[in-house]
């Protein structure tokens, strides 16, 4: 078949569009090189996809993308909610060029109240269950801890671990400073403690007035029974709760859980600021910075803001808690998206664009926070991009796209040969990529042999890359001088990798920052960049992060080894008995503090063995 007889890709695409069903689903556009351009969802695939191929498209960016479409794929789903879920997964996994992308963050923290006889409250992050009560989510760990402090002041709930609670014979410091009612030593009845837990839960759900009425009734009842000491304790609770309510902005309407979302677009970047109100209390906010905003399929910043808002709602809430009310600073008409979210969460969502009163103040705060966060990002981004450019120029690297420039840095850490660990940190997209950090436990080497440790970690890291699996960075940064760099060279030669990627950072005289020398293995002479060099500042930032990451891992490993090793050295203490001792006394420190009688009370520990344990630990 001649070139003139070859089928027209556009004709094939239009033919495919004409055959699409009027059903919900997800569509994907590809260019001639089979690169994924865009992923979208639709209630009606045929109607939605056909709209892209109209003659007069409102957005020039959309028209530009449509010109590049060489083929399309579709997946039919049972509902629009299912399409929303699939679209979200594909966007996050495949990262199409024209989709606005919000990077996955850690799950939000919760405040947990356990379902035990004497419940404890705790900071929690992870999947929720039905055995315990969970309140949140909260925008930050700080917000959870602040709420816990309030509950300690007002309701005196315990926060201690169960092993500590079960073995206390006298109240702890928290009871002495009036932050715990002392249920561990029966200073409060089970019924009164349960009432405090119930009131704490009501407070977190926004039923503060009801809690105040309950406490006032309880205080009057104690007074009538001439139990003035108990009445005074309840009065203190009322005063503490009143102070909290006075200090914080409280929502008095019917819906106590609200999310306030403000979007700002400027300079090709966007910021989404999410503020959370839970139980009527404003818990703070969190800023998000999506990528691919400069490729968004919109014609103006106002339209891009709408696209960013839609992308945030779809990607953020698809697997997270959605409150009953959303307050947005960007108006949009997206009934299909909201119906899909409501189907996903199982309850009605009230969307507000023009709030009044307290809610208006909250939206203004969120909007201002977005402006400040975006201004800070643009400022930092400008300086960080400049440093990246300086480093690329200083090393003489040919990088077609500065955004893709990638550095991996290695550091070895140990204490006199104990608990040796190697760390690898990653710099990419002008920022440290925490999610790509890795630690490597180093085994089967002579203690303290940093060269052998470096050889082991580099082999483990790049053996797969040499076999075609994984990504090779533009620079491999080694925290060390000629010896470490020579070991890296040997590994790269062995694996058939480019040795010019290796850059060593030799510490200067007195280990002073700014006096470092860059060491190469491909014939280039050592290079001193100078104290004021932006390139050196970036190298120092990456190297220091690798060192920090290695040190924290090494300390944790060493502490764990020491905690178990002291008990392992005692004859007659196996894994099961060791576990029982640690569980009973809440850790090695508790075992050390225990008396012989306490040790002998543990199942499987005889009097003689208890004496042996006590002697070994003292």
UniProtKB/Swiss-Prot annotation:
Species assigned in the record: Janthinobacterium sp. (strain Marseille)
Gene name in the database record: uvrC
Family statement: Belongs to the UvrC family.
GO cellular component: cytoplasm; excinuclease repair complex
Localisation per UniProt entry: Cytoplasm
One GO MF term: DNA binding
Subunit structure: Interacts with UvrB in an incision complex.
SUPFAM superfamilies: C-terminal UvrC-binding domain of UvrB, GIY-YIG endonuclease, RuvA domain 2-like
Name by which UniProt lists this protein: UvrABC system protein C
Ranges for domain UVR: 209-244
Principal place of residence: cytoplasm
């Amino acid at each position: 078949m001649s070139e003139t007889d070859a089928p027209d890709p556009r004709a094939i695409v239009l033919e495919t569009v004409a055959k699409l069903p009027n059903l919900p689903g997800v569509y994907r556009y590809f260019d001639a090189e089979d690169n994924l351009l865009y992923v979208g969802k639709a209630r009606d695939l045929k109607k939605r996809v056909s709209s892209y191929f109209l003659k007069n498209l409102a957005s020039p960016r959309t028209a530009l993308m449509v010109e590049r479409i060489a083929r399309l794929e579709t997946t039919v789903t049972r509902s629009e909610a299912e399409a929303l879920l699939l679209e979200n997964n594909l966007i996050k996994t495949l990262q199409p060029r024209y989709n606005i992308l919000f990077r996955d963050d850690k799950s939000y923290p919760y405040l947990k109240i356990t379902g035990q006889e004497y419940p404890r409250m705790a900071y929690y992050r992870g999947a929720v269950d039905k055995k315990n009560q969970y309140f949140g989510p909260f925008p930050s760990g700080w917000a959870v801890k602040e709420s816990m402090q309030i509950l300690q002041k007002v309701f005196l709930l315990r926060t201690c671990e169960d092993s500590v609670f079960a073995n206390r014979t006298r109240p702890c410091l928290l009871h002495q400073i009036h932050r715990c009612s002392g249920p561990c030593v029966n200073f409060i009845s089970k019924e009164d403690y349960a009432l405090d837990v119930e009131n704490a839960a009501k407070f977190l759900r926004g039923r503060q007035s009801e809690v105040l009425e309950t406490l006032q009734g309880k205080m009057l009842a104690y007074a009538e029974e001439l139990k003035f000491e108990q009445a005074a304790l309840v009065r203190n609770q009322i005063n503490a709760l009143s102070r909290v309510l006075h200090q914080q902005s409280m929502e008095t309407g019917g819906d106590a859980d609200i999310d306030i979302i403000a979007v700002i677009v400027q300079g090709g970047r966007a910021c989404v600021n999410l503020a959370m109100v839970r139980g009527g209390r404003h818990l703070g906010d969190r800023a998000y910075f999506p990528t691919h905003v400069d490729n968004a399929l919109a014609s103006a910043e106002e339209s891009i803001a709408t696209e960013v808002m839609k992308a945030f709602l779809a990607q953020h809430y698809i697997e997270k808690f959605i409150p009953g009310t959303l307050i947005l600073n960007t108006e949009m008409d997206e009934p299909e998206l909201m119906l899909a979210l409501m189907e996903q969460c199982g309850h009605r969502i009230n969307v507000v664009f023009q709030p009044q009163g307290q809610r208006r103040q909250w939206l203004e705060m969120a909007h201002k926070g977005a402006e400040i966060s975006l201004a800070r990002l643009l400022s930092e981004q400008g300086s960080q991009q400049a440093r990246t450019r300086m480093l690329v120029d200083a090393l003489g690297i040919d990088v077609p796209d500065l955004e893709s420039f990638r550095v991996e840095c290695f550091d070895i850490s140990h204490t006199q040969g104990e608990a040796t660990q190697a760390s690898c940190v990653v710099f990419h997209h002008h920022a440290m990529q925490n999610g790509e950090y890795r630690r490597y436990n180093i085994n089967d080497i002579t203690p303290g042999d940093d060269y052998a440790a470096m050889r082991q970690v580099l082999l483990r890291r790049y053996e797969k890359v040499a076999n075609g699996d994984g990504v090779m960075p533009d620079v491999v940064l080694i925290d060390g001088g000629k010896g470490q760099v020579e070991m890296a060279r040997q590994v790269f030669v062995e694996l058939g990798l480019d040795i010019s990627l290796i850059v060593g950072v030799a510490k200067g005289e007195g280990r002073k920052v700014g006096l470092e020398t860059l060491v190469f293995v491909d014939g280039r002479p050592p290079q001193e960049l100078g104290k004021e060099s932006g390139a050196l500042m970036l190298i120092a930032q990456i190297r220091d992060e690798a060192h920090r990451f290695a040190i924290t891992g090494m300390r944790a490993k060493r502490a764990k080894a020491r905690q178990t090793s002291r008990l392992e050295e005692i004859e007659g203490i196996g894994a099961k008995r060791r576990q029982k001792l640690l569980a009973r006394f809440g850790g090695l420190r508790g075992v050390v503090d225990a008396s012989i009688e306490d040790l002998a009370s543990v199942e499987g520990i005889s009097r003689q063995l208890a004496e042996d344990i006590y002697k070994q630990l003292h």
